[in-house]
Curated annotation (Swiss-Prot):
Keyword terms: Lipoyl
Gene Ontology annotations for the cellular component aspect, listed alphabetically: cytosol; glycine cleavage complex
The protein's name: Glycine cleavage system H protein
Lineage, broadest ranks: Bacteria, Pseudomonadati, Pseudomonadota, Alphaproteobacteria, Rhodobacterales
Family statement drawn from the similarity comment of this UniProt entry: Belongs to the GcvH family.
Listed NCBIfam families: gcvH, PRK01202.1
Lipoyl-binding domain mapped to chain residues: 19-101
Gene3D superfamilies hit by this protein: 2.40.50.100
Source organism (scientific name): Dinoroseobacter shibae (strain DSM 16493 / NCIMB 14021 / DFL 12)
A GO BP annotation: glycine decarboxylation via glycine cleavage system
Length: 122
């Protein structure tokens, strides 16, 4: 069964075995407003925790996406790049950004659980 974690940067990461799906939270999507552009890295790219791995631009602001963990991109959500406004419709579901292979599962212990994230956003 997948386990979901959250970051201080308003990203979620759903982990099952050594694979994780990454996206931005509903709270972040609401704060951004209507998303008009998304830039994602290609499959096969590797990154370390904290690296910039994408950009989400809205009518209000641009926001960098930072890697919540170290890994390799298995899949980028190409459909979301084509229709960025979909991110506002289902940010914590079908509008995920990446599927990745985890390099260091130990990094997950540094992330927030649902209760911790709820406390963060008040």
């Amino acid at each position: 069964m997948p386990t979901t974690y959250y970051t201080d940067d308003h990203e979620w990461i759903e982990v099952e075995d050594d694979t994780a799906t990454i996206g931005i939270t509903k709270h972040a999507a609401e704060q951004l407003g209507e998303v008009v552009f998304i830039e994602l890295q290609p499959e096969g790219e590797t990154f370390v925790k904290g690296d910039e791995i994408g950009v989400v631009e809205s009518v209000k602001a641009a926001s960098d996406i930072f890697a919540p963990v170290t890994g390799e991109i298995l899949e980028a959500n190409a459909a979301l790049v084509e229709t960025p406004a979909e991110l506002n419709e289902d940010p914590e579901g079908n509008s995920w950004l990446y599927k990745i292979k985890l390099s260091d599962p130990g990094e997950l212990s540094e992330l927030l659980d649902a209760e911790g994230y709820a406390a963060l956003i008040g």
